[in-house]
Amino acid sequence: MGSYLNPGNFSFRGSLRSKIYVDKSELIVKTNEALCTEQKYICVSRPRRFGKSMAANMLAAYYDRSENTEELFHNLAISKDKSYKENLNQYDVIKINMQEFLSMSETMEEMLEMLKNYLVADLEETYPKVRFRDGKNLIQVMKDVFSYTKCPFVILIDEWDCLFREYKQNKEAQRKYLDFLRAWLKDKDYVAMAYMTGILPIKKYGSHSALNMFTEYSMTDPGELAEYFGFTEPEVFGLCDKYEMSFEKAKIWYDGYQLVEHKKEKEECHSMYSPKSVVEAMLRHRFGTYWNQTETYEALKIYIQMDMDGLKDSVVRMLAGESVSINIGTFSNDMTTFATQDDILTLLVHLGYLTYNVTDQTVRIPNKEVSQEYVNAISTMSWHGVADLLDSSHKLLEALWALDEEAVAAGIEKAHEEIPILQYNDENSLSCTINLAFYFAREYYSIIRELPTGKGFADICMIPRQEHLDKPAVIIELKWDKNTIGALKQIKEKNYGNALKAYQGKVLLVGINYNKKSKKHECAIEVMEK
């Protein structure tokens, strides 16, 4: 057993001993299928703390032929698969964390030299009887070992993209690094499988990837590996039940990453949760912001303040709960090459700050935890209109509960005045105004939009969450160049809308009218029992 060659199972054993361990071992079924085939090159990209390193440790423990690890896997799901015994402890494993080597070196060249020397040292120590043709050449050393053992390598590279995050501007260093990986891995018989994980997909130059032999599984196209990184909804439900925590709250805080797996018969959508956040919430018995503690909101701030091509407007709309159309095809898979706002939004998907809907090609903010990071970032930027509006949404909600019609009208008016994109030219803009003005209402309500296209009004229904049933339900109808009485009448004629069909209790009917000539808002509120 070496430091990098056949490193053992200590890390994975630690995962199994943890208070919370969610079995993702069926990932091994997929990697077993790829062994020694044209599909043996796999690259998985996910945000921080989504279980990438744990999965790499699991694969190392499973394939490492220097130890018998059956005791670690015999109770896991993989043990029931027909490929389990066939591949258990059958390969030489090389496992490296590129961030470790980068942290120990001053330049990219020094990092690669150190990596090659350390791997060669492990190989020579493990196989002293092998006659090495060139002890300084990593590729030749691995060829010599493979010729001697007839046992190919499973190569696991964690944090493969760290150089692109640390050397953002150094294109030459990036290119040399990719050239090294290609020379080391591509078309090599000694590779049974090359498995890389990172945050970014593989860097593209022009229309081509330097590592085009890899099959990529990313946040925008997770493929058949969708369910193995992050916690699925059934897994989170089981943890909430075990730790006596509210599943509804867990969903509000951490759900929202919709990863679609394309199958022969249908598309299967996996609702994924951040594992770090869910585990911390269960163990602390408190819902809060945990995933984002891995890096401050400054990381998000850097990108959303690049107000190119309407980026600020898109962020404001997403804060209001809307989705924004996006073209992910122009993204260069790095952190500096941005031609349009779509490239920045695509990067935010890979970083975990947005979720991508492959069906309608839109992005949105996934959950409360991530939304709070946007609020934190905006509060320190020059977006004063947005920051002030979010801050004052507390008072607007209290005014609504107090039936203060003038204060509610003033709050909606403030949103309309201070945010340039909120022009009343369609139903989406109407609802965006209401959602942003009542941003804080999400603490208490599920907010549902009903937008009859072309009718000149927008319905917003606020249904109290289970733990806030003491609050009234709310229906808001915003119209332009009509009147508030007509708005209230229309709510009643529609029997409160579809969203409140099953609701019983107190309902606030809120009619808001905008007069285009006076540019003033009027508000009328009625209290009803349903």
What kind of feature is each model-predicted range?
Residues 154, 472-476, 508:
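Structural motif
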Residues 434, 458-462, 471-482, 494:
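Conserved catalytic cores of phosphodiester-cleaving nucleases, focusing on short active-site segments
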Residues 174-179, 480-497:
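Mg2+/Mn2+-dependent nuclease catalytic core
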Residues 438-446, 502-504:
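Short secondary-structure junctions
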Residues 1-426, 441-444:
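Phosphate-binding site recognition
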Residues 144-149, 442-469:
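Active-site metal-binding core of divalent-cation-utilizing nuclease and nuclease-like domains
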Residues 499, 503-530:
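Domain-level recognition of nuclease-like catalytic cores that cleave nucleotide substrates
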